[in-house]
């Protein structure tokens, strides 16, 4: 009685045990995680209980039987003669599955599944098939050998032979493209040349010997992957499609390269409009580099600034100012007869003269955090020379082109033109003549 009670205790709570397993795994189909051996044992135990106690088989055991039968049908469907009509990817997957087979069902499900025999790597290294002819393993052995790279001591020779074959094909392709008497590559041919496995005929003309050799080589190589009834298209009516790869790359580079042309830019030269007012401004220090300006601004309060000549030839003036407890510098740029600290940004304030630009940045509320603060000018401690003062007065009364009309020597004219800027007027494009 104790043994019967222990057996009943082990068998009776089977349904409740499955529910608790469902609760642990968190989803209903957790029972499918069990191995095939446990499923078959549970099925046999349920049949024994049904014969002794006349109890119906639970719905869960029926679902497991259906799942086993469906898997059996799927495996039967994937094996056997159906293996021959599948795609290359599916064939490779099935071949790998044969090397690492799926666990077989025990009991009544085992006869319908393939055998556990594996194809080892040592067997794949053999030159001859070690399996009986026309067997399933022999078919898979030949299939893997056809679609894998041979790993042998003579692999270098195989690679060199393959490279020589590729060079020969490239030479044949280049020779075929240069021959204009081939109808397949002419512009007048309107129909493609089609070659089948049984016949080689071109509707637009004949095929040369090199083309036939290329077709036979391709048909021999492709016979492993494609059936004999498939049609191989050799050429089309478009010459552009049959161009070699290097010619197409040259055409793409020519299309992508920008056109070559020369440009002629016309400038107008203008004198600084307010050079006299700048010289009269006490914050203008004339010619000075940034290191001398930093020495003058050292220890000065926030907003102290000075105006000086820029050290770069492309710019006329620069400001050195004190902000964020350090000495900073900003160039004054010119664009379209307007002066600003950033000529490429239309949102930045610009002025037609230098003095108006300095007046704008005196107000701290008008200055952004990245803009110079020019609230307190640093007074110049020396006077300018009489020569410089005379230049400012003359430039205030004439123009850049008007200086050439003045009855003065040429060196003096160059001296008067020193403070000027260039403004772009127009851009002329001069195309390069085509080389004949």
From Swiss-Prot:
| Record comment regarding domains | The SOCS box domain mediates the interaction with the Elongin BC complex, an adapter module in different E3 ubiquitin ligase complexes.
Q: Does the keyword Cytoplasm apply?
A: no
* Lineage: superkingdom: Eukaryota
Q: Give TM segment ranges.
A: none
Its BP terms in the Gene Ontology are: intracellular signal transduction; negative regulation of epidermal growth factor-activated receptor activity; positive regulation of proteasomal ubiquitin-dependent protein catabolic process; protein ubiquitination
Write out the pathway annotation from the protein's UniProt entry.
Protein modification; protein ubiquitination
Q: Which PROSITE patterns match?
A: SH2, SOCS
Q: What is this protein called?
A: Suppressor of cytokine signaling 4
The record, for Pfam families, names:
SH2, SOCS, SOCS_box
Q: Give Gene Ontology CC terms.
A: cytosol
* Sequence ranges assigned to domain SH2 in this UniProt record: 283-378
Which InterPro entries does the protein's record reference?
A: SH2, SH2_dom_sf, SOCS4/SOCS5_dom, SOCS4_SH2, SOCS4_SOCS, SOCS_box, SOCS_box-like_dom_sf
Q: What does this protein do?
A: SOCS family proteins form part of a classical negative feedback system that regulates cytokine signal transduction. Substrate-recognition component of a SCF-like ECS (Elongin BC-CUL2/5-SOCS-box protein) E3 ubiquitin-protein ligase complex which mediates the ubiquitination and subsequent proteasomal degradation of target proteins. Inhibits EGF signaling by mediating the degradation of the Tyr-phosphorylated EGF receptor/EGFR.
Q: Which organism was this protein described from?
A: Mus musculus
List, for all copies, the residue spans of the domain called SOCS box.
Answer: 373-422
Q: Which UniProt keywords apply?
A: Growth regulation, SH2 domain, Signal transduction inhibitor, Ubl conjugation pathway
* Annotated Basic and acidic residues bias: 9-25
Specify where the region named Disordered lies, as residue ranges.
1-25
């Amino acid at each position: 009685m104790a043994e019967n009670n222990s057996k009943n205790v082990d068998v009776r709570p089977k349904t409740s045990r499955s529910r608790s397993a469902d609760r642990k795994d968190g989803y209903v189909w957790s029972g499918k995680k069990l191995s095939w051996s446990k499923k078959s044992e549970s099925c046999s135990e349920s049949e024994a209980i049904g014969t002794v106690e006349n109890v119906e088989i639970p719905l869960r055991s029926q679902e497991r039987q259906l799942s086993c039968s469906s898997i059996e049908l799927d495996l039967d469907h994937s094996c056997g003669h159906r293996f021959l009509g599948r795609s290359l990817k599916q064939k490779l997957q099935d071949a790998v599955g044969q090397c690492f087979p799926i666990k077989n069902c025990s009991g009544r499900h085992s006869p319908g599944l393939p055998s556990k025999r594996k194809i080892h790597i040592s067997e794949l290294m053999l030159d001859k098939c070690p399996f009986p002819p026309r067997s399933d393993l022999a078919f898979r052995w030949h299939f893997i050998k056809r679609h894998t790279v041979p790993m042998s001591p003579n692999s270098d020779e195989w690679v060199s032979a393959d490279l020589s074959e590729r060079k020969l094909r490239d030479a044949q392709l280049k020779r075929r493209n240069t021959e204009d008497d081939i109808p397949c590559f002419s512009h007048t041919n309107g129909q493609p040349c089609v070659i089948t496995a049984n016949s080689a005929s071109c509707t637009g003309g004949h095929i040369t010997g090199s083309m036939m050799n290329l077709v036979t080589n391709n048909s021999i190589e492709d016979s492993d992957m494609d059936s004999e009834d498939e049609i191989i298209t050799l050429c089309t009516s478009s010459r552009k499609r049959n161009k070699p790869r290097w010619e197409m790359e040259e055409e793409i580079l020519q299309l992508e390269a920008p056109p070559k042309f020369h440009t002629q830019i016309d400038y107008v030269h203008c004198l600084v409009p307010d050079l006299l007012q700048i010289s009269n401004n006490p914050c203008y220090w004339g010619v000075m580099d940034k290191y001398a300006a930093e020495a003058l601004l050292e220890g000065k309060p926030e907003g102290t600034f000075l105006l000086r000549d820029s050290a770069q030839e492309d710019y006329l003036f620069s400001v050195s100012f004190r902000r964020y407890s350090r000495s900073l510098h900003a160039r004054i740029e010119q664009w379209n007869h307007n002066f600003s600290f950033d000529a490429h940004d239309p949102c930045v304030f610009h002025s037609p003269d230098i003095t108006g630009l300095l007046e704008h940045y005196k107000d701290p509320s008008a200055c952004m955090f990245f803009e110079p603060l020019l609230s307190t000018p640093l007074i110049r401690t020396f006077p300018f020379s009489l020569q410089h003062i005379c230049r400012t007065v003359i430039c205030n009364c004439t123009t850049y082109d008007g200086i050439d009309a003045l009855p003065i020597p040429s060196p003096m004219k160059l001296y008067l033109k020193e403070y000027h800027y260039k403004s772009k007027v127009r851009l002329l494009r001069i195309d390069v003549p085509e080389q004949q």
